[in-house]
Amino acid sequence: MTLEEFSAAEQKIERMDTVGDALEEVLSKARSQRTITVGVYEAAKLLNVDPDNVVLCLLAADEDDDRDVALQIHFTLIRAFCCENDINILRVSNPGRLAELLLLENDKSPAESGGLAQTPDLHCVLVTNPHSSQWKDPALSQLICFCRESRYMDQWVPVINLPER
């Protein structure tokens, strides 16, 4: 590896960390503003009804999910719909960290609630446009620019690794 290649690889890693931090900030704000839709079925319903209001689509799966044929078909359809409607798409490689960010801290565990609680489907997460302008949010602007740059390099669904805390 030459010095130029090493420097380029190091810059790419730093850029991915920055994009991961921006995604974390966008999810935090969207959660507090209640502009998140969680679940493959719920996402499909929203995309069918109001695709113009969706600014970001996250697809999350681990290695076990990669063998789930039905889920992969859903992902393919969602990706195609998002590309057709100019919706930015990111693939999250660590769904466990995504679950930590999206699940409410005050939610009780199944043992505490006295029954079996169903874990929400976090394979697909949509962030919708809040009433205020999306361009006022620098983190969302950074994600949109990253998605656009990735498309220019023929990477239509870039993979992001959310930073562990």
UniProtKB/Swiss-Prot annotation:
Induction: By various types of DNA damage and growth arrest. GO terms for cellular component: cytoplasm; nucleus. One of its GO terms (molecular function) is promoter-specific chromatin binding. It is found in: Nucleus. The modification Phosphothreonine is found at residue 2. The keyword Cell membrane does not apply. The keyword Cytoplasm does not apply. InterPro entries: GADD45, Ribosomal_eL30-like_sf, Ribosomal_eL8/eL30/eS12/Gad45. Might affect PCNA interaction with some CDK (cell division protein kinase) complexes; stimulates DNA excision repair in vitro and inhibits entry of cells into S phase. In T-cells, functions as a regulator of p38 MAPKs by inhibiting p88 phosphorylation and activity. Interacts with AURKA, PCNA, GADD45GIP1 and MAPK14. Belongs to the GADD45 family. This is Growth arrest and DNA damage-inducible protein GADD45 alpha. It comes from Rattus norvegicus. The gene is Gadd45a.
